[in-house]
């Protein structure tokens, strides 16, 4: 997103509205968090810079790698020090990418402005400092605030208990300020969060206890209460827990959460991974919040797998900047879907494409229809490569016409469900989007093979453009 510079700068970072952002410049670079943690390769995780300009000679290539100084971090999500929430502040500058490490609890701050094609390490926030001042560990999602502070959801205490989770505040110099939520107002589990200031509300979601999920997924842990099924509704910016929404058995493991981008809207969605439902949340007439299942992905009956039924596992989703389309992935099934959400209560399937998954042709796992027929999905080869793993993180271009896809979820879960990723690494694909009639099609000219990295195959996770995007920027 366009940034003003110099003495004539009259606005802060980003754009005044989501629709202005849609008309922003086409992406030329994308930053990708890449992981060696958990792979058995004793190398530091790194931030990859990928060239996504089709007119460039290095299109679809990694053009720079910034290794972090430690081993075993598990870089995961990323966010900015400033975004469109600071658009009204000319002194604010989108310069630093925040990289929380999910396993080590370190937080890296990366300077992307000195050389956008070759970012450099600016600061390391050490876990001891975070724990000493807040008791928090396992940092996940970061969002910048209009105040200039940075807020990071943390999933537990240093021992991996969910009970210690909450929200970390860093100041504009990346010093630990403390917790955001008021004492006694911590959520039961932590994961993602999104705020909608005009409705004075922040809502956070629930993964599970770090002591459980860091060891891999065990269905028994769900029954033992080690995974979440709640949304936590907070007053914004005060940090008071006002309401807890129990999503019940239809909302097990609610992960990514997004409001509609239009800041006047009082509705959004959360992707519930295990039950594979997109749940819509909304404000009611009395000012409280409620929820309903908006999209349901039925589990597939399968043969030759660990269970007789396979959930889709919705692990990521996003909403186009004009709030017309919602996109989500089914990490285990292997498809990416596009829904028209112009009527948010009634999403309509507009596009679907298979780009991996456990039931693709050539896999030992087969799906079984109700009448007993078996089938497997057709997955295209791209530049001679058969897609590995399943679609996991996604990022959409500002104009809504290109969707980028990586395939690593979390190293221990990758090893459990897609062991070939450990041996062959991740990749990144690009899907062309029809925004008029709907439809998704794999771009045959784009394939980034993180299996061919100089230090060995790595796992690619979240993607960010230098100028912000539909999953980093919040309008006030």
Q: Where are the regions a protein language model picked out?
A:
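Structural signature of eukaryotic scaffold interfaces centered on beta-propeller domains
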Residues: 2-26, 74-93, 135-147, 194-200, ...
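Beta-propeller domains
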Residues: 2-11, 19-127, 160-163, 171-174, 183-345
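Short loop/turn segments immediately following beta-strands, especially the blade-tip
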Residues: 49-58, 109-120, 173-174, 233-239, ...
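Surface-exposed loop and turn segments in beta-propeller and other repeat-based domains
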Residues: 61-80, 122-135, 180-188, 241-251, ...
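Asp-box/WD-like beta-propeller blade repeats and closely related beta-sheet repeat scaffolds
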Residues: 112-197
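Loop/turn-rich, solvent-exposed surfaces of beta-rich toroidal or solenoidal domains
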Residues: 265-283, 307-421, 426
């Amino acid at each position: 997103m366009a940034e003003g510079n110099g003495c004539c700068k009259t606005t802060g970072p980003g754009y005044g509205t989501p629709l202005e952002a849609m008309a922003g410049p086409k992406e030329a670079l994308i930053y990708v968090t890449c992981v060696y943690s958990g792979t058995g390769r004793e190398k530091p995780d790194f931030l990859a810079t990928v060239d996504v300009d089709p007119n460039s000679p290095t299109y679809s290539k990694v053009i720079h790698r910034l290794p972090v100084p430690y081993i075993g971090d598990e870089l995961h999500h990323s966010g900015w020090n400033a975004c469109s929430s600071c658009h009204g502040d000319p002194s604010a500058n989108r310069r630093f990418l925040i990289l929380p490490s999910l396993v080590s609890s370190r937080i890296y701050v990366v300077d992307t402005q000195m050389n956008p094609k070759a970012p450099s390490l600016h600061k390391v926030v050490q876990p001891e400092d975070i724990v000493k001042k807040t008791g928090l560990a396992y940092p996940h999602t970061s969002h910048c605030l209009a105040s200039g502070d940075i807020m990071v959801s943390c999933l537990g205490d240093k021992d991996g208990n969910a009970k210690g989770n909450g929200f970390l505040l860093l100041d504009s110099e990346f010093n630990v300020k403390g917790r955001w939520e008021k004492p006694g107002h911590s959520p039961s589990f932590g994961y993602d969060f999104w705020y909608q200031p005009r409705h004075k509300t922040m809502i956070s979601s629930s993964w599970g206890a770090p002591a459980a999920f860091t060891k891999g997924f065990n269905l028994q842990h769900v029954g033992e209460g080690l995974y979440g099924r709640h949304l936590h509704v907070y007053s914004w910016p005060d940090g008071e827990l006002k309401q807890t929404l129990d999503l019940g058995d239809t909302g097990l493991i609610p992960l990514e959460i997004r409001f509609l981008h239009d800041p006047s809207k009082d509705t959004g969605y959360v992707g519930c991974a295990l039950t594979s439902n997109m749940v819509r949340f909304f404000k009611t007439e009395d000012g409280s919040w409620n929820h309903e299942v908006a999209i349901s992905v039925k589990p597939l009956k399968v043969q030759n797998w660990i269970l007789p039924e396979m959930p889709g596992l919705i692990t990521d989703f996003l909403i186009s900047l004009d709030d017309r389309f919602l996109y989500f992935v089914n990490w285990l099934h292997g498809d990416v879907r596009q829904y028209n959400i112009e009527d948010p209560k009634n999403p309509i399937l507009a596009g679907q494409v298979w780009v991996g998954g456990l039931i693709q042709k050539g896999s030992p796992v087969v799906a079984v229809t109700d009448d007993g027929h078996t089938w497997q999905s057709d997955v295209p080869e791209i530049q001679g490569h058969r897609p590995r793993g399943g679609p996991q993180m996604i990022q959409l271009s500002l104009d809504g016409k290109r969707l980028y896809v990586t395939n690593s979820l979390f190293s221990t879960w990758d090893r459990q469900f897609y062991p070939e990723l450990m041996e062959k690494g991740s990749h990144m694909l690009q899907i062309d989007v029809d925004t008029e009639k709907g439809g998704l099609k794999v771009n045959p000219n784009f394939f980034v093979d993180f299996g061919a990295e100089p230090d060995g195959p790595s796992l690619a996770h979240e993607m960010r453009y230098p100028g912000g995007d539909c999953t980093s920027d919040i309008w006030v």
